[in-house]
Structure formats: structure tokens, C-alpha cells
Amino acid sequence: VSDTKKASDVFIECLEAEGCEYIFGVPGEENLDFLDSLGKSDKIKLILTRHEQGAGFMAATYGRHTGKTGVCVATLGPGATNFVTSAAYAQLGGMPMLMITGQKPIKKSKQGRFQIVDIVSLMEPVTKYSIQIAAGDNIPSRVREAYRLAEEEKPGATLIELPEDIAEEPTTDWKPLPKSVARRPSAEPKAVRAAVEAIEKAKSPIIVIGAGANRKMAGRMLEQLVEKTGIPFLTTQMGKGVIDERHPKFVGCAALSAGDFVHRAVEASDCIINVGHDVIEKPPFFMQDNGVTVIHVSTKTAEVDPVYFPQIEVIGDIGNAIWQIKEDVSPNRDWNFDHILAYHQAELEHTGKLADDARFPIFPPHLVKQVRECMPRDGIICLDNGVYKIWFARGYTAYLPNTVLLDNALATMGAGLPSAMMSAMLYPDRKVMAICGDGGFMMNSQEMETAGRLGLNLTVLILRDDAYGMIRWKQANMGFADFGLTYGNPDYVKYAESYGAHGHRVESS
């Protein structure tokens, strides 16, 4: 019977064939065959975490950094339900991830309904693909399909449920399916020509860089387009760092407030080149029928929206489309960017004063400046969610792509520390800082043990206000009484030391 293989062994071989390096998670009884097969692999390392959510955030961040699918594992029932937030984080944020979950036997007695939840159905709204393996022979095609869908634009989350009895059964069809080399389609030349004509005809074009442009090649092509044409650019929060923000044509990052400097700069333009727009982030402009041309450059056509109806769409691989536009466009001598760039100048003068305000307790713009000064060029900051995220999105100058990891999609709390841990694992020679509020940090602070066990080189900055500050701020803004949002905190210095980390309390600015 030498031509059969145990199904869980086949699963691991398929993951190896896909180039899987790590599996993050908390295995349970229903994963023990899978765990045994994983233990025999010399290519894949198990990273054991203290909560499934931390594992899911790490897997998603692996996908965000590398473009390859991050893999995580959990048991049935409560293990798998703990992945729901991680799945939504990856799905909305465009990060390729595969979750592998256990389940009770499906062919023989389940011993009642203990711990059984229909995880495949539960995950459908927050994944691109959610499937149960009902026969071991299906594993190679299911794994290949999960990877294909996770990584295809727009990337996202996938789930494969591997029941206990299927994991241990012998399979005959066990060869991993090879990846096909699929090139993404190029934009149609007529669409490119229409876009170029509109850009050349405009008086003050501007480029908006969104989440979809934050992929490997698009950044280089965008920089070349800006160099050739001199057209100013701004980013959304998820597009931050695609081009070095010290560039003289950088206008800012659109975060939160309409009517501010960045939005005024966009309003001064008559042609908006919107690159990699993702509806998850509202565009930093609201279209009116006022003669402003909007060009949508993306892998997919624009979703219908009363405030977003681009007149010209250039659909195809984004990097390639930008290259085609750059090759075709002739810079127009009559273009005038003074008005647009003046808003950026005004913003710099405005924030410069704030950043030098050394009051204590520390003032957020001052903190942003201090962090930027101490982080090297390729240093990575990983933001949890709170008011400080807006300050950093707007005020922290990103020099390289993926050096400011923030989540403006699901915008969950609790991902700051796990995303920093993943960054430190992938880039052990780079400085990594997790920047968390006290609320977000405590949601996954147990992963400090994991970070210590893995010997990760990272710093955690906790901004403590003893409250869910973002909501408290909005509560005050909306005229409500201050109620229901404050709490106490542990002594964070002792807390850090209890995990074997160094703890410091900042006593002055």
C-alpha cells in the first residue's frame, strides 16, 4: 500500500509546495494529526501563540509584508470563532491569509454536538473562500485554490476546515498541484490614451494613492510618473509610504477631517488620478458634478457610489497601467501646482508649531516627531487603533512602503502588538515599534510572552489615558456627557518585567 499517504501529511506537503514558512496558532485535539505531520516538516515552523486572534493578526501581517499567504491554525468551535476578527482584518485590509481549523469527525459518530459550530458558514461573509475537506483526495486542489484566491487582487482571507477523521485517512491522490504562472492583464491602450488626454488637458492634476497601490511594483512606477510629470500626490492612510513622503511633490495623508489642508489641496485640482482606490477607505474627496475629472486606475472597475463616479477607468495591473500612462504622457507647460502645494506648506507651518510643544503629559504631535527622529529610515511602526493613529497617519513621515502599518479598513483594536511581532520576525535587523493605546494593548497583551519566547527585537510604546479615548473624544464632540468609557490599568513597568521585558515609564516630554 506504498502509494497511499496520510491526509494530514499531504496537507503539509501542499503547504510546503506553496512556499509556506510559518504556521501561527493554537492547536487543539482535533488538529493533532495535522500537528504531528507539521512536526515532521523541516520547511515549516510552528509559532505557538497565546490566543488565536494574535495568530491570525500575525498571519495576515505576514501576507501584508510579503504578498504571500500567511497561514494560521486553530481547533474547532471556540478556537475557530476566535479567528473571526482576524479574518475580517485580512479580508477588509487586503491581506492574503489561510486559516486551517479542526472539526469533529464527519463520517462517524460525533459524540453529540459538543463544541460543534458551523465554522464554514460562519466565515463565509469575511472570507473569499470557506470550505470543508470531505475527502483527503481533495486536499491538493483545495489548498491550491485557497492560495490562489487569497493572493489574487484584492487579496483576503480563506478558510479550510479539516475534520479529524479526514486528517487521519489514507489518500491516493497526494501530489501537490503546481502553481500556474498567471500574469495580471494589462490596461487597454484606448483607456490609457483617454486618461493621458485628460491629464494633459487639465490645469492642475493631482495623484491620490490608495490601498491598492501599496503593492510591490506600483510604488516604483508611481515615483517615476511623479518624477517625469511633476504632478503632486497625496495618499490615503492605507497608501502611506508608497512614495517617500519627503518628496517635494508630497501633499499629505488624508486622515479623518474633511476641510483640512489635504482636502483643500484636492479641491484645488481639476483632474484627480485616483490610483488603487479601495472603497474600504472613503476617497479623500467627494465627487460632485462640477467639471472635475476623476480617473480610476485599479485592478477592478469602480463600485457604484453616489460620491464616486469616475469618468475614465483604466483597469488592469496597477503598476503596468501607471507605466503605460508615464510612457505616453507629455508634461504640459501650462500646468500650475502652486495652489495645491501652498496648502501643504501651510500644513507644515501649522503642524511645526504643534510638534515643538513639549508640554507634559505629552502632546501627540510632539510624540510623533520624537518617534520619527529616533526611528531609522527602514524602521517599522505598527499602530494599534485609537486617536494617536490619526496623528501618526498625518504627521509621521514615511520613507519606505510598509514602514507604517496601520489598519484603516476593519480598524480593529488589538492588532498593534501582533503586527509588530510579525514585522520583527520577518525583518530581524530592522527597528520595529508597536504603538498602542492602553485599550488596544490589553486586548492582546498576552502575546508579550510569545514575543519573549521568540526572542523578538521590538519596542512597545503604550499611550495611556485610562480610557477608550477615541470614543470618549467623539462622545465629547457630539455633546454627550462623559460616561462609561474609563477604566484602570496595571503597572505597565512591572507588567513588562513579568514577561521578561524591560519596562520604562516616561516621566517628562
Give residue ranges: language-model regions.
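Phosphate/pyrophosphate-binding active-site segments
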Residues: 2, 174-175, 291-387, 503, ...
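Glycine-rich, anion-gripping cofactor-binding loops and their flanking helix/strand elements
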Residues: 64, 211-295, 399-421, 425-430, ...
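N-terminal cofactor/phosphate-binding cores enriched in small/glycine residues
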Residues: 4-93, 384
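Active-site nucleophile and cofactor-binding loops and adjacent substrate-binding regions
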Residues: 26-28, 46-57, 72-79, 134-135, ...
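Structural signature of the thiamine diphosphate
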Residues: 21-22, 60, 64-74, 78-101, ...
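Glycine-rich, acidic loop regions that bind phosphate or pyrophosphate groups
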Residues: 101-142, 239-340
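Thiamine diphosphate
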Residues: 100, 108-115, 305-307, 313-315, ...
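Active-site diphosphate/adenylate-binding microenvironment
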Residues: 8-11, 16-18, 34-41, 345-429
